[in-house]
């Protein structure tokens, strides 16, 4: 099964390559990710749909995948903590999340057999009330770059964050439903080619 992951995320690429042998990855250009003030579940769905609309469907791939992940502000279910654009922005986000629980939302769209399938899931993560020294270490490491909410659960923040509810894949960028669908599709494509 030949998968095209339309995402610049190294983490997403690594996750798919861990499970599927043939993954090509390309970044989408020009997708507007600014969304009006809606519940985060609707925001990730909207952005994933825009990404799906921008994917050039071709015969070189069997499956196409797009995804969007946002961290919900613990104080406002319609405010997303997206990717910080500076160290100062990352500090602000991590201070907001430190010592608290928050939701992480992912929407994943999978195109196969001539149709898109959308799934949206959330997970709850609790971040320790870590010290200012740890905050400085997290910022200086650059682990916040390109990460929703300014952290990477599978990176340095993994020492200070606990998954309370939901799937780790949801926090890292894909819904579990989509991962299960991809596994089913792989079986289907394997059978059809044998």
Task: Give the label of every model feature segment.
Residues 3, 37-194:
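Anionic-ligand binding patches
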Residues 8, 28, 113:
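Cofactor-binding loop segments of dinucleotide-utilizing enzymes, especially the Rossmann-like FAD-
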Residues 13, 22-24, 68, 124:
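A general secondary-structure boundary signal
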Residues 1-21:
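N-terminal beta1-alpha1 ligand-phosphate binding loop
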Residues 20-37, 116-122:
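Short glycine-rich, Thr/Ser-proximal phosphate-binding strand/loop in the N-terminal lobe
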Residues 12, 32-34, 180:
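Flexible, glycine-rich phosphate/dinucleotide-binding loops
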